[in-house]
């Protein structure tokens, strides 16, 4: 009888402790959309990726061009991606380098989406099966990574990139990396 109660009690206490730790982090002003990532401080995973329109193959050297870049994970099935798309177009017009990762999507739908809504990406990579997303630790779309000019990931953000997120969170990191290059 005591053993039957011990497992649920331990599980309950573990969940309660995790909840309290997260509440404390939020109260201290930590950004709940900033996901911890084992890849922060490490290079973009090495993988051969195909470009959406030209079927050209890229390696992680794409992220080693000497300038920082946003790696934006998106999909046509993602309503939040639709919401952020107009703002990404604005950033691209301002000169922000953005590489798109079309995540678990159908290529014809993605090409039509970009034709109809505009293409903010310098390069659009296909990840139809989600294997590169898995390597990045992506669990949904949209997610955005800030990568420096040497291909090292500096930040990971889950959610839509909008004016507030850009100016308060992402832009300071992007600008700092731009100055260092």
Swiss-Prot record:
A Pfam family: Redoxin
Topology of this chain in the membrane: Single-pass membrane protein
InterPro entries: Periplasmic_diS_OxRdtase_DsbE, Redoxin, Thioredoxin-like_sf, Thioredoxin_CS, Thioredoxin_domain, Thioredoxin_ResA/DsbE_sf
Cytoplasmic side: 1-4
Any one GO CC term of the record: plasma membrane
Gene3D superfamilies: Glutaredoxin (3.40.30.10)
Entry keyword set: Cell inner membrane, Cell membrane, Cytochrome c-type biogenesis, Disulfide bond, Membrane, Redox-active center, Transmembrane, Transmembrane helix
Chain's role: Involved in disulfide bond formation. Catalyzes a late, reductive step in the assembly of periplasmic c-type cytochromes, probably the reduction of disulfide bonds of the apocytochrome c to allow covalent linkage with the heme. Possible subunit of a heme lyase.
Annotated protein name in UniProt: Thiol:disulfide interchange protein DsbE
Species: Haemophilus influenzae (strain ATCC 51907 / DSM 11121 / KW20 / Rd)
Lineage: Bacteria, Pseudomonadati, Pseudomonadota, Gammaproteobacteria, Pasteurellales
Gene designation: dsbE
